């Protein structure tokens, strides 16, 4: 929001407050002033001058010798090359000794001296707006109004000591997107009187009305308009209006457009002016229809659909509702009859529509945040008065259609609650004074916690919905600087920590220690990733995605990790190991609204990792090989230590059907680990298969308490057991069977380890092993802490394992 200080002070003028103090007050009230600067650079000795006569330079075709009255008591001869110089005009004149601003940013100031131009003496310089750094217009001299007083300092005449404010507004402060809105804040902060422009109804001199129908009350809540005939569109915009527009960052276009823009900046009301003679029949405010097109004022031709609001006549669309008018009914210099429109558009109906077509407008910026719905008629009267004053014409009656206005429900503020939130003592009188200064209507009552204020938000305040909004208003006007800085006071309470539960930070460090690097991805992903890696055909969609590719919430971390692997591979990284800790999102009807939950959605934290390329950094002591399933399985087992994970085959849409496993801790599934499915290697252009895992973070954090075991001083008995079984038999099932047999035999406490150390699959059948069989070799280590194990005990333990394998899997000892 950009505006001049002088314009603001016509609405609210705190006389004893300087520019710097005013800027500071606005910033501390939440209206951050990004920049304050003069409208013109410093210069002096430039005055209003009257060109008395001109004649051609005797030695140059493009120069004129001018006789100028600059109020010095004598006529000055000045040589000028401007194309628009002529007798009778008034222009800025730099006298001898004046110093003009540098022509370029890094240049030096330019001093005016008595000089000769092609042999003719010149005693000054007639100036353009560009030479004074007032604008970029270089079409000729800056022509001043005829009533400009000759000899007056141009800084004083044009108010060039005025300051331009640039305010950075937060999205909730749509009520301050106008001079009126900022002035309301200044009045509340300083006590200055708020003065508004005259918005009295103009005299109605014709009875003409344009038929209007509002077919979409969920798009437009109020539509006001009026016919004005006989306007002069070629009328010049007054200098004072042009000046205020330019100092607000707006370029003067034509009187009709300038008036509309002026009132938008003044009162915050975007409006639109139609050429009445180009409208076919009446207007219909409705949602668009698929396939309809409109050429906009910016020259773009766009196609609308049922999600975009439009204003249409009996033949075609004439305006994109609340965003931009159409080219077909645009006013021109030949326009004589107009239809003036001001409406209340529902913010939800405007939000995101302009961005959809890759442009933005001041109107859309305001309407999508909320514009006052109670003052459309008053603002039309203001615009009409300016049009009649500048362009002339005859005004018809205002046609006001009220169809669906917001219902303002009172918002309660508990005085005790405000004191707790702000940490200060507040009297009832202070809060009441704040609301009165902000023009917020309220009533008082007594509640269980003390006094309660019931505030009804005004029609221009769309940011007041809950109690905290009112507390913020109290804090802003009371003054953040008046709130003393005090350290928080809390009871010191010793709470036991759960030694068996690790923090997320520890889990991250453990992953980093396994040579994985952390990445942080967006929680919204491509819909294709959800289908490919999670078999999710109904993902949670975003209502307003930041990009079309990032349109759904992720239910798995795998897609984001794979994308980052490809990103690194494209930058010539040969070995990539990444992990991420973050939330995923699932539909779950059992989840209710809570402090950290949203009804219908389960949001668990997950930890996932991916490894691609060589298992180790290249070095002379290790043979280079690619990472495999067992490398990553070992990493995962390390993360869960000292808890022991059990693995079982799993089918997962992202993983290889024969090289993937589900992890179980205490019989509960906690995640998956495996090699990427071959079909994704080709589709995502990978030359080898990455290995990845995805685990529940809560399970990783449950480390369990460490248990201490006595170290035996007696020798261990080690036995190797080679058995032949069918190739379909799973090793994990055999290990479980042997451990169960040892426990049943009473030898389970002696078993220090039981591992598979060899596997043999014959290429052809033999007498020892059939074609559909395999040989597995297990090593069991038995050791007691109280005594040396006798051979009978060891043999009995081995025998019970062999018997168990034979009974469960028809295993036989290998000969």
Swiss-Prot record:
The keyword Transmembrane does not apply. Gene3D superfamilies: 3.30.56.10, Bira Bifunctional Protein, Domain 2, Ferrodoxin-fold anticodon-binding domain, Nucleic acid-binding proteins, Phenylalanyl-trna Synthetase, Chain B, domain 3. Its EC number is 6.1.1.20. Its main location: cytoplasm. Residues 40-155 form the tRNA-binding domain. This is Phenylalanine--tRNA ligase beta subunit. The keyword Methyltransferase does not apply. It catalyses: tRNA(Phe) + L-phenylalanine + ATP = L-phenylalanyl-tRNA(Phe) + AMP + diphosphate + H(+). Residues 712-814 form the FDX-ACB domain. Residues 406-485 form the B5 domain. The gene is pheT. Belongs to the phenylalanyl-tRNA synthetase beta subunit family. Type 1 subfamily. One of its GO terms (cellular component) is phenylalanine-tRNA ligase complex. Tetramer of two alpha and two beta subunits. It is found in: Cytoplasm. Its cofactor is Mg(2+). GO terms for biological process: phenylalanyl-tRNA aminoacylation. Binds 2 magnesium ions per tetramer. One of its GO terms (molecular function) is magnesium ion binding. It is an enzyme of class 6 (ligase). Mg(2+) binds at residues 463, 469, 472-473. The lineage of its organism: Bacteria, Pseudomonadati, Pseudomonadota, Betaproteobacteria, Burkholderiales. Keywords: Aminoacyl-tRNA synthetase, ATP-binding, Cytoplasm, Ligase, Magnesium, Metal-binding, Nucleotide-binding, Protein biosynthesis, RNA-binding, tRNA-binding. PANTHER family: PHENYLALANINE--TRNA LIGASE BETA SUBUNIT, PHENYLALANYL-TRNA SYNTHETASE BETA CHAIN AND LEUCINE-RICH REPEAT-CONTAINING PROTEIN 47. SMART domains: B3_4, B5, FDX-ACB.
């Amino acid at each position: 929001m950009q505006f001049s200080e002088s314009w603001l002070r016509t609405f609210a003028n705190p006389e004893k407050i300087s520019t710097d103090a005013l800027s500071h007050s606005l910033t501390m009230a939440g209206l951050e002033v990004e920049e304050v600067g003069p409208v013109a650079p410093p210069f002096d000795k430039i005055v209003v001058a009257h060109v008395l006569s001109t004649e051609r330079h005797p030695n140059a075709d493009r120069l004129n010798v001018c006789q100028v009255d600059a109020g010095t008591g004598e006529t000055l001869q000045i040589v000028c090359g401007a194309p628009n110089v002529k007798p009778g005009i008034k222009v800025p004149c730099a006298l001898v000794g004046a110093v003009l601003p540098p022509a370029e940013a890094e240049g030096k100031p330019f001093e005016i001296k008595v000089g000769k131009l092609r042999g003719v003496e010149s005693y000054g310089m007639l100036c353009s707006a560009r030479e004074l750094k007032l604008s970029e217009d270089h079409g000729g001299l800056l022509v001043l109004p005829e009533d400009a007083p000759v000899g007056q300092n141009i800084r004083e005449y044009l108010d060039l000591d005025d300051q331009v404010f640039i305010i950075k507004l937060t999205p909730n402060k749509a009520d301050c997107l106008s001079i009126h809105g900022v002035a309301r804040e200044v009045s509340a902060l300083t006590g200055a009187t708020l003065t508004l422009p005259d918005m009295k109804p103009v005299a109605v001199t014709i009875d003409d009305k344009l038929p209007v129908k509002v077919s979409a009350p969920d798009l437009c809540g109020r539509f006001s308009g009026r016919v004005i005939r006989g306007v002069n569109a070629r009328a010049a915009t007054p200098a004072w209006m042009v000046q205020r527009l330019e100092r607000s960052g707006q370029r003067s276009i034509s009187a009709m457009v300038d008036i509309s823009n002026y009132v938008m900046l003044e009162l915050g009301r975007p409006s639109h002016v139609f050429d009445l003679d180009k409208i076919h029949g009446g207007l219909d405010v409705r949602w668009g229809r698929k396939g309809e097109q409109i050429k906009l004022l910016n020259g773009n031709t766009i196609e609308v659909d049922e999600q975009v609001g439009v204003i249409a006549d009996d033949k075609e669309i004439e305006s994109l509702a609340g965003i931009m008018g159409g080219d077909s009914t645009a006013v021109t210099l030949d326009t004589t009859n107009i239809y003036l429109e001001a409406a209340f558009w529902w913010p939800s109906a405007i939000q995101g529509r302009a961005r959809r077509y890759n442009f933005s407008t001041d109107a859309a910026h305001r309407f999508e945040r909320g514009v006052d719905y109670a003052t459309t008629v008053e603002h039309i009267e203001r615009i009409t008065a300016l049009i009649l004053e500048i362009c002339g014409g005859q005004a018809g009656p205002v046609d006001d259609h009220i169809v669906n206005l917001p219902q303002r429900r009172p918002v309660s503020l508990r005085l005790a609650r405000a004191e707790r939130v702000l940490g200060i003592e507040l009297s009832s009188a202070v809060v009441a004074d704040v609301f009165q200064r902000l023009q917020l209507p309220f009533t008082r009552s007594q509640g269980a916690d003390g006094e309660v204020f019931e505030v009804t938000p005004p029609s221009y305040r769309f940011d007041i919905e809950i109690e905290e909004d009112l507390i913020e208003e109290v804090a802003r006007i009371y003054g953040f600087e008046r709130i003393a800085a005090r350290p928080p006071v809390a009871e010191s309470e010793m709470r036991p920590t759960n030694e068996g539960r690790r923090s997320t930070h520890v889990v991250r460090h453990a992953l980093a220690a396994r040579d994985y690097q952390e990445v942080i991805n967006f929680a919204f992903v491509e819909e294709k990733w959800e289908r490919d890696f999670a078999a999710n055909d109904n993902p949670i969609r975003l209502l307003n995605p930041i990009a079309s590719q990032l349109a759904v919430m992720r239910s798995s971390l795998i897609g984001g990790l794979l994308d980052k692997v490809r990103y690194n591979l494209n930058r010539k990284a040969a070995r990539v190991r990444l992990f991420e800790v973050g939330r995923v999102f699932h539909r779950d009807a059992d989840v209710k609204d809570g402090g950290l939950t949203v009804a219908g959605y389960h949001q668990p934290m997950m930890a996932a990792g991916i490894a691609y390329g060589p298992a180790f950094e290249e070095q002379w002591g290790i043979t280079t090989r690619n990472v495999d399933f067992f490398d990553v399985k070992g990493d995962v087992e390390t993360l869960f230590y000292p808890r022991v994970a059990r693995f079982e085959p799993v089918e997962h849409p992202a993983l290889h059907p024969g090289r993937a496993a589900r992890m179980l801790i205490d019989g509960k599934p906690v995640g998956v680990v495996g090699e990427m499915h071959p079909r994704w290697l080709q589709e995502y252009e990978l030359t080898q298969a990455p290995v990845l895992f995805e685990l529940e973070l809560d399970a990783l954090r449950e480390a369990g308490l460490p248990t201490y075991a006595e170290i035996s001083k007696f020798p261990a008995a080690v036995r190797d057991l080679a058995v032949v079984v069918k190739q379909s038999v799973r090793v994990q099932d055999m290990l479980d069977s042997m451990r169960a047999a040892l426990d049943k035999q009473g030898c389970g406490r002696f078993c220090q380890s039981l591992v598979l150390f060899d596997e043999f699959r014959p290429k052809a059948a033999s007498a020892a092993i059939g074609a559909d069989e395999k040989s597995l070799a297990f090593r069991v280590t038995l050791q007691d802490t109280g005594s040396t194990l006798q051979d009978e005990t060891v043999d009995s333990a081995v025998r019970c394992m062999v018997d168990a394998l034979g009974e469960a899997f028809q295993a036989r000892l290998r000969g």
